[in-house]
From Swiss-Prot:
It comes from Capsella bursa-pastoris. PANTHER family: NAD(P)H-QUINONE OXIDOREDUCTASE CHAIN 4, CHLOROPLASTIC (PTHR43507:SF21), NADH-UBIQUINONE OXIDOREDUCTASE CHAIN 4 (PTHR43507). It is found in: Plastid, Chloroplast thylakoid membrane. This is NAD(P)H-quinone oxidoreductase chain 4, chloroplastic. InterPro entries: NADH_Q_OxRdtase_chain4 (IPR022997), NADH_Q_OxRdtase_chainM/4 (IPR010227), NADH_UbQ_OxRdtase (IPR003918), ND/Mrp_TM (IPR001750).
Length: 500
């Protein structure tokens, strides 16, 4: 059963099925939409089935592994495999992409191309999470950028070309560092290139060289995460992109950067990570405060939510930097948690825009009476974003706190200072999120406008909102469901460190 190429099928299926849509006769936008949704649902069911029957949670080693010779000339292999670190992100990718496709129903212009790009992005993201070969990881990383650029450049606001150009300059520029790191690591210390991640995990390097590799990978993943000061592409991109694209960006794309930090920087380069972790922790703490302070000054609704994403990614960076079992588990839980919360907030921001055609918060107000369902869902998900107890964000941030407290690597005074600054950031978070809700839904601005009337959530939008809310509450009540997937892998990664 395990010899069956599950992962190859899971990676190749979305882009292959999407390609058929481009060559088949155009049957109307509705056919394209339902075809894409059926592909996404089938892919998600296939992934879930493959993992349920073949993945063993108590095994930290690579499972469902596939190893095929691909290009003889380069001695290049198609290596796939999953472990506790990648299974959660792959399932998150399937879930969010399916809902984003359903959210994209209002898109009518170039519908075939739009849905093909979403499916191509789907393949690239799953390929990145399941690659066990460093060069294959890089190829999948780059494959995923092209659909994102086109989705940004062709569908969105008035400044979409500017934001798409900024996105590609940042990400393509950072990919140069990723490629240099991949080639450097693969060519070091052997006559033949070594690209197998399992072999590279046992490789040791001179200190200076390991630091150089670490910095190269860190720059690449810092842009994607994003880590300040390499975050400035994110608010512009979210501000202009169609909200279904924003769901994919916030829900999955940002998580690829955090995944790369754990998979490559932390697992392959433990000595350099141990040296850089105090600085990363300081940067993560500053990021929480900076984003929480900058967000209230944003007039654009989606830009304000984008800065909340930057703030939440700070907790992931701190968890990764703590080099402890609770810290890293908390970071992985926050990756999954914010994937749901970020996607949900952008979806609700987009549905609000579909009704009032306004993007600036100071022009909104008084919508709560007319659209009570959207108001209720937005309020609940804002509470999830500010880490209300019972929601997934609360337990993730709490575990990260425990990770800092239990870390033996840092002095007590340093830990107290970090926790104090993080606490200030957590106080600022409700201020900008509740202020955002107040500006949107309370007051009388739109009610006093002549001919003011718009409809509340329909069945599709309500289904989408509830579908994302269920896992947020589910993880908040029973986080062990997610934590149990990665716990053995986390212990395996931390066994390379002297602190734990």
């Amino acid at each position: 059963m395990n010899d069956f190429p599950w992962l190859t099928i899971i990676v190749v299926f979305p882009i292959s099925a999407g390609s058929l849509m481009l060559f088949l006769p155009h049957r109307g936008n509705k056919v394209n939409k339902w075809y894409t949704i059926c592909i996404c649902i089938l892919e998600l069911l296939l992934t879930t089935y493959a993992f349920c029957y073949n993945f063993k949670m108590d095994d930290p080693l690579i499972q469902l592994s596939e190893d095929y010779k691909w290009i003889n000339f380069f001695d290049f292999y198609w290596r796939m495999g999953i472990d506790g670190l990648s299974i959660g992100t792959i399932l998150l990718t399937g879930f969010i992409t399916t809902l984003a496709t359903l959210a994209a129903f209002p898109v009518t212009r170039d519908s075939r191309l739009f849905h093909f790009l979403m499916l191509a992005m789907y393949s690239g993201q799953i390929g990145s999470f399941s690659s066990r070969d460093l060069l294959l990881f890089f190829i999948m990383w780059e494959l995923e950028l092209i659909p994102v650029y086109l989705l940004l450049a062709m569908w969105g606001g008035k400044k979409r070309l500017y934001s798409a150009t900024k996105f590609i300059l940042y990400t393509a520029g950072s990919s140069i560092f990723l490629l240099i790191g991949v080639l450097g690591i693969s060519l070091y210390g052997s006559n033949e290139p070594t690209l197998n991640l399992e072999l590279l995990a046992n490789q040791s390097y001179p200190v200076t060289l390991e630091i150089l590799f670490y910095i190269g990978f860190l720059i690449a993943f810092a842009v994607k995460s994003p880590i300040i000061p390499l975050h400035t592409w994110l608010p512009d991109t979210h501000g202009e992109a169609h909200y279904s694209t924003c769901m994919l960006l916030a829900g999955i794309l940002l998580k690829m950067g955090a995944y790369g930090l754990v998979r490559i920087n932390m697992e392959l380069l433990p000595h350099a990570h141990s040296m850089f972790s105090p600085w990363l922790m300081v940067v993560g703490t500053i990021q929480i405060i900076y984003a929480a302070s900058t967000s209230p000054g944003q007039r654009n609704l989606k830009k304000r939510i984008a800065y909340s994403s930057v703030s939440h990614m700070g907790f992931i960076i701190i968890g990764i930097s703590s080099i402890t079992d609770p810290g890293l588990n908390g970071a992985i839980l926050q990756i999954i948690s914010h994937g749901f919360i970020g996607a949900a907030l952008f979806f609700l921001a987009g549905t609000s825009y579909d009704r009032i055609r306004l993007v600036y918060l100071d022009e909104m107000g008084g919508m709560a009476i007319s659209i009570p369902k959207i108001f209720t869902m937005f309020t609940i998900l804002s509470m999830a974003s500010l880490a209300l107890p019972g929601m997934s964000g609360f337990i993730a941030e709490l575990i990260v706190f425990f990770g800092i407290i239990t870390s033996q690597k840092y002095f007590l005074i340093f830990k107290i200072l970090i926790i104090f600054v993080m606490a200030i950031g957590m106080i600022l978070t409700p201020i900008y999120l509740l202020s955002m809700s107040r500006q949107m839904f309370y007051g009388y601005k739109l009610i006093n406008v002549k001919n003011f009337s718009f409809f509340d959530s329909g069945p599709r939008e309500l289904f989408l909102s509830i579908s994302i809310l269920i896992p947020i509450i589910g993880i908040g009540i029973y986080p062990d469901f997610v934590l149990s997937l990665a716990s053995d892998k986390v212990e395996s990664i931390l066994s390379n460190y002297f602190y734990g």
